[in-house]
Amino acid sequence: SGVEAAIKDEIEAFKLSLPAGYSLESDGEADTAAESQGQIISSAAIFFVLIVIGLVAALNSFKQAGIILSVAILCIGLSFVGLVIGQQNYGFIATVGAIGLAGLAINDSIVVLSHIKEEAEKNGLTKAKLVEVVIRSTRHVLTTSATTIGGFLPLLFASIFFRPLAWGMVVGVIGSSIIAVFYIPAMFIYLKKIQS
């Protein structure tokens, strides 16, 4: 926390001035928060590996799984942008929000990518058809994003404790919708040669 950082140097100087045989140890919320944050990040790494395996199995393509994973990484960055926009401090709750957003953000991208793949396998895919598929998918993307953002609005305005999580999630979900509609089709075109 900010208070802990402000007095840390003074505490270290005080430790050095203690007489022989005396020591000073700190404990409390800061240590517990650091331990909890370490546990959640190590758990997230395990689940990240499971997500990769699941995506490769579902999409049957390492490249397409890579596209979806890049969306997750971009959206984690967007959650930190949300903290800046909302003028919130980074902490344990913000970390939980960023990790949760990684899973939530890929949903819209999977919907768009699966619609594109379905159309490509059925009829072949031109750029004009790609635009039609993305426009059709946009309704699903906007609906899921609007309901998710609506669910976080009470936390955004009413809850001080969960406000960092809510800001990160709301900005991340808005960003993930934009990414799903523009980035996913662009990457699909990049990976597959599509006729004009």
Task: For each feature predicted by the language model, list its residue ranges.
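Nucleotide phosphate-binding site architecture
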Residues: 33-34, 156, 188
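Hydrophobic transmembrane alpha-helices and their membrane-interface caps
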Residues: 53-125, 130-136, 142-157, 171, ...
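Charged/polar, solvent-exposed surface patches and flexible loops
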Residues: 9, 13, 118, 132, ...
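Transmembrane alpha-helices and their membrane-interface boundaries in multi-pass membrane transporters
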Residues: 108, 166, 170-196
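Membrane-interface catalytic loops of GT-C/OST-like multi-pass glycosylation enzymes that act
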Residues: 159-164
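Loop-to-transmembrane-helix entry motif
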Residues: 29-47, 65, 133-144, 168, ...
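Non-catalytic alpha-helical coupling and interface elements of nucleotide-dependent molecular machines
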Residues: 11-12, 16, 45, 54, ...
